[in-house]
């Protein structure tokens, strides 16, 4: 892989991991169009590792929030009052919201790996329509401070849906938050905080299992480093941009993006450019891997 291609993949990962449009769908299709198949262990390792860059972007961007939540949760637990402060409660609610995706990933991973490009196209369109409904019907009034245990669990279930390729981790969780009445920015902020435990755990596992595939592959190793750095830096900027966008604007642009991407993938399948089935296991969706 050339360094230019690696940088483009890193940029694509950053954009589609945090925007509610599905990083899995875009990376797989972009890879197919450039002649990179997940049958190639080196490309699979590359795709997995560059996603660590966007995880790093979340950790750096929300470092103050994460430190405050962890400290408050630990302090409350030590004092025998684990839910004694708003920060402590939010910290434990994030843990609660992580459980559905962790359980679903453990039980369904191998079945989901068998899903093909038609599922990606369908998920892009279906979840785009749900996002449209959330945008039009939700009240958009609640803040992150208003998250309760029920909210965290329901948004956690939405995060588990991101196991389906094309759904987008950020897409399902932001949509879920909006349907529960949260503002667009609050839904996105909680979505990003909720992603931390599952992406750290699953990312560490995937890194451990895929890094050996790059041994002795100097060119691929350099390309992977470039892609990871680009995804981290660009990911930080995308988070900042998205939160600012959602503060004053709607998600309609992402609805259009999803519908157009789903239609484009369907057209590519029908024309024979993309295979209909999954020729190799896709990388886990953003929440579990390796989004959106």
Swiss-Prot record:
Pfam families registered for this protein in UniProt:
BacA
Compartment list = Cell inner membrane
One GO-annotated biological process of the protein: response to antibiotic
Give the membrane topology: Multi-pass membrane protein
EC number, UniProt record = 3.6.1.27
**One GO molecular-function annotation for this sequence?**
undecaprenyl-diphosphatase activity
Q: Does the keyword Transmembrane helix apply?
A: yes
State the reactions this protein catalyses.
Answer: di-trans,octa-cis-undecaprenyl diphosphate + H2O = di-trans,octa-cis-undecaprenyl phosphate + phosphate + H(+)
What's a single GO CC term here?
plasma membrane
Q: What keywords are assigned to this protein?
A: Antibiotic resistance, Cell inner membrane, Cell membrane, Cell shape, Cell wall biogenesis/degradation, Hydrolase, Membrane, Peptidoglycan synthesis, Transmembrane, Transmembrane helix
Q: Could you tell me what this protein does?
A: Catalyzes the dephosphorylation of undecaprenyl diphosphate (UPP). Confers resistance to bacitracin.
- Miscellaneous notes: Bacitracin is thought to be involved in the inhibition of peptidoglycan synthesis by sequestering undecaprenyl diphosphate, thereby reducing the pool of lipid carrier available.
UniProt record similarity statement: Belongs to the UppP family.
The name this protein goes by in its record: Undecaprenyl-diphosphatase
Species, as recorded: Anaeromyxobacter sp. (strain K)
